[in-house]
Design a protein with these regions (language model features):
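Conserved protein kinase catalytic/activation segment
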Residues: 29-39
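ATP/Mg2+ or Mg2+-diphosphate-binding catalytic cores
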Residues: 101-144
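Active-site activation/catalytic loop segments of kinase-like enzymes and analogous catalytic loops
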Residues: 50-81, 92-110, 125
Length: 144
């Protein structure tokens, strides 16, 4: 996976301080009781790059580019190209990571779910982004 290594190297060029993260913020892990918003499911929580948390969430929610910019601005105070690029690259890493997780689950889980199909879907989505015209721009923006 040389492209994954390139992403890691680009992200490590200017690393961000890690912050407490849930690392699994998909829609099902939010509960809104009308008075308060609850975040649940902390089995993967720990300190991480905040752009992974944001990128993973944007990927899971299938946010548009404008929504991704809004999330970036809400967290960092501005939709900075370098931070958006980090989020976009972490959206790829989210799909790669969850795709690998699903491939493992396909072999070991007793749950009646098509984990293998889900793994293929996630990998395909990651590959599509790595093959996109925007990928090289994100890699450059991360370093700037």
């Amino acid at each position: 996976m040389p492209t994954i290594q390139r992403i890691e190297q680009a992200m490590n060029f200017k690393p961000l301080a890690t912050v407490p993260c849930n690392n699994d913020l998909l829609a099902e892990n939010y509960i809104d009781d009308g008075r308060q918003l609850w975040l649940i499911d902390y089995e993967y929580s720990g300190n991480n790059d905040p752009t992974f948390e944001l990128g993973n969430t944007c990927q899971e929610m299938q946010f548009s580019n404008s929504q991704i910019s809004e999330v970036c601005a809400a967290y960092f105070g501005d939709a900075l190209p370098g931070m958006i690029a980090r989020m976009k690259l972490n959206m790829i890493m989210s799909d790669v990571g969850w795709g690998l997780w699903a491939a493992i689950q396909a072999k070991i889980s007793t749950i009646d779910f098509d984990f293998w199909g889900w793994a293929i879907e996630r990998w395909g989505r990651a590959q599509e982004k790595m093959d996109s015209a925007e990928f090289s721009k994100w890699m450059k923006d991360v370093a700037s």
